């Protein structure tokens, strides 16, 4: 049975009950379908993932209002797919405590939802076939659309307008190539979100596109207390944050303690609030820095 350890409304009270409705009406099932109760069936394993990651079928009830409620007035019988990452399947990392990656996945969703970023599919804690872990609604990504957002091209084929070159290298045949990303407002929202949560692994494969939306996935190594921002989305480095982006950052900072107390430790929450303060004071997206590898590898 699916046992949701923390529903969307479990994180705080009062102001912390605000949802991403401030960013307009939800228009994608990955933002509105919250698994409530039911069974998880393993469909297959996603072998390319570094940790144990399973495609699952969830059969049972789910809330479709974006925020669960105790009386389940919004519940409907449903069958949907998700990505299940059991805690016991986490690979040890030298710089992140073992057994915390699933909580960080859920924390990233909560920041996205609460701040109104709407860039992370619904993610909850659940008891699955291999024990507790994170459970995220599956997004059927449109590969052609992703290619219009992040791409790998010959250096002499980098477009003059609408794209940012991020890093250059060499292909297997020693021909020069460049990683580029689009100057796209949806992608920029993901870049702002990553700067706030200190995402250490924004690869091209962690960017999905579906029904006009852009999503980020794989947030298990976010929220470190040290600066570990590592991303392909450096095209807006140093650019001024918009008032809408600043409002989202302030919203998260103001509600961070209640929002994330069950998911992150005090030092990690404090570091999040300090990053928010730094972004607000500077008013700009951060630049890459020299004391950390700022491009994920491999980039795709």
Label each residue range with its predicted role.
Residues 1:
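Non-catalytic, low-structured ubiquitin/UBL-interacting segments
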Residues 4, 97, 210-300:
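C-terminal catalytic region of ATP-dependent kinase domains
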Residues 20, 30-35, 42:
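N-terminal, Lys/Arg-enriched amphipathic/low-complexity engagement segments
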Residues 36-171, 176, 192-200, 204, ...:
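Conserved ATP-binding subdomain of kinase catalytic cores across diverse folds
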Residues 101, 182-189, 200, 226:
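Short capping loops/turns at secondary-structure boundaries
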Residues 133-196, 233-243, 247-274, 279:
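ATP-dependent phospho-/nucleotidyl transfer catalytic cores
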């Amino acid at each position: 049975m699916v046992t949701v350890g923390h529903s969307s409304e479990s994180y705080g009270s009062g102001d912390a009950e605000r949802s991403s409705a401030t960013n307009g009406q939800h228009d994608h099932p990955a933002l509105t379908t919250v698994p409530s109760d039911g069974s998880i069936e393993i469909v297959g394993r996603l072998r390319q993932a570094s940790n144990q990651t399973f495609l699952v079928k969830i059969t049972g009830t789910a809330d479709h209002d974006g925020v669960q409620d105790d009386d389940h007035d919004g519940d409907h019988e449903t069958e949907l797919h998700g990505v299940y990452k059991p805690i016991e399947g986490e690979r040890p990392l030298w710089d992140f405590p073992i057994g915390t990656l699933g909580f960080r996945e859920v924390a990233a969703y909560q920041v996205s939802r609460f701040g109104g970023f709407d860039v992370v599919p619904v993610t909850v804690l659940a008891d699955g076939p291999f024990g507790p872990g994170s459970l995220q609604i599956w997004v059927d990504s449109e590969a052609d659309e992703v290619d219009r957002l992040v791409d790998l091209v010959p250096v002499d084929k980098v477009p003059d307008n609408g794209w940012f070159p991020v890093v250059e290298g060499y292909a297997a045949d020693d021909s020069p190539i460049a990683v580029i990303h689009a100057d796209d407002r949806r992608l920029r929202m993901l870049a702002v979100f990553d700067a706030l949560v200190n995402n250490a692994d924004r690869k091209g494969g962690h960017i999905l596109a579906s029904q006009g939306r852009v999503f980020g996935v794989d947030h298990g190594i976010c929220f470190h207390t040290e600066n570990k921002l590592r991303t392909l989305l450096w095209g807006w480095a140093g650019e001024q944050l918009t008032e809408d982006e600043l409002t989202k950052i302030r919203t998260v900072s103001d509600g961070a303690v209640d929002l994330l107390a069950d998911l992150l430790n005090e030092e990690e929450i404090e570091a999040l609030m300090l990053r928010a303060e730094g972004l607000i004071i500077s008013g700009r997206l951060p630049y890459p820095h020299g004391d950390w590898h700022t491009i994920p590898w491999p980039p795709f």
